[in-house]
Amino acid sequence: MIQQESRLKVADNSGAREVLVIKVLGGSGRRYANIGDVVVATVKEATPGGVVKKGQVVKAVVVRTKRGVRRSDGSYIRFDENACVIIRDDKSPRGTRIFGPVARELRDKDFMKIISLAPEVI
């Protein structure tokens, strides 16, 4: 479960490698984020020369979770790590490439640009 103080790997080439969740968006008392939810995070680790710098506050969408998600047909999908993609305010990704698989649930939440850039949609 992704909550405040959770650390996520960044699955794009925006320059950030790891972020720490500051807030889960979507309601005043919202505690947990799942796949497709937007969080506010700060960059804890970044690569030199990237678009995003260490210490910067960014918005990100969760694309993979260890907890997984239940689908309407009764199946579950879960991943080996918790990962996110850094986004702009218009839901478009800051980077130009996405690394690793992403869940199909992002399509329902209207993150079509991330779906199209991802190498695999599960």
From Swiss-Prot:
It comes from the Bacteria. GO terms for cellular component: cytosolic large ribosomal subunit. The keyword Ribonucleoprotein applies. The keyword rRNA-binding applies. InterPro entries: Ribosomal_uL14 (IPR000218), Ribosomal_uL14_bac-type (IPR005745), Ribosomal_uL14_CS (IPR019972), Ribosomal_uL14_sf (IPR036853). GO terms for molecular function: large ribosomal subunit rRNA binding; structural constituent of ribosome. Keywords: Ribonucleoprotein, Ribosomal protein, RNA-binding, rRNA-binding. GO terms for biological process: translation. Belongs to the universal ribosomal protein uL14 family. Part of the 50S ribosomal subunit. Forms a cluster with proteins L3 and L19. In the 70S ribosome, L14 and L19 interact and together make contacts with the 16S rRNA in bridges B5 and B8. Binds to 23S rRNA. Forms part of two intersubunit bridges in the 70S ribosome. This is Large ribosomal subunit protein uL14.
